[in-house]
Design a protein with these regions (language model features):
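PRPP-associated nucleotide enzymes
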Residues: 1-191
Length: 191
């Protein structure tokens, strides 16, 4: 496992972790922006992180039969973790605003399912995946992600999240910006 510092360095070098002043899709402002697609677009660098995350998942979950990844962010990491753990991996996608299984994907009854995401912030997508698992009468093995940037206040997930790295990403309403963030012009272009 890479050190926290080296992990952050990889995320910064791949532009998966940016620092500055950003307006997030929620409308909140933040000095950090995370885009795991940038990490995953460089497989030779993402490989180290994926292998370490797969080891953590294997250590923390006794039984996983299937990996379910919400589209679009979870697809690549779901595939990589599935490959490393030798587990079938499927994804769900939105149709009329709700996650559904398409493309011939299904979840067998009593299957133990791991939900795999790139980043977990509020857990909303993960909890929508839980509905699909329950509807299929399968079992939730747990939750995993490359980055856990959740905070207790906004998190919908009540179970432990296994992540490669936990990053504190403070957010602020536009009328409550700290002085140092007010001085930096903000960017929308990463959304």
């Amino acid at each position: 496992m890479l050190s926290h510092r080296k992990s952050l360095n990889i995320l910064k070098k791949t532009n998966a972790l940016l620092e500055g002043h950003f307006v997030l899709s929620s409308g909140l402002h933040s000095p950090k922006y995370i885009q795991c697609a940038k990490l995953l677009s460089q497989p030779h660098k993402a490989d180290l992180i994926c292998k370490s995350l797969a080891k953590k998942i294997k250590k923390n979950f006794k039984k996983i039969d299937l990996i379910l990844a919400p589209a679009i962010g979870g697809i690549v990491i779901g595939y990589e973790i599935g490959k490393l753990l030798k587990k079938e991996t499927i994804f769900c996608e939105r149709l009329n605003g709700k996650f559904v299984l398409r493309r011939g994907f299904f979840i067998k009854r009593n299957t133990s399912v791991l939900i795999m995401e790139d980043v977990i912030t509020t857990g909303k997508s993960s909890m929508e995946c839980v509905k699909l698992i329950k509807k299929s009468r399968a079992k939730l093995a747990g939750f995993a992600s490359i980055i856990d940037r959740s905070n207790k206040k906004n998190l919908k997930i009540k179970k432990k999240i296994i992540s490669y790295i936990k990053i504190d990403v403070p957010t602020f309403k536009s009328n409550q910006l700290p002085a140092n963030l007010k001085k930096i012009p903000y960017a929308f272009r990463y959304l």
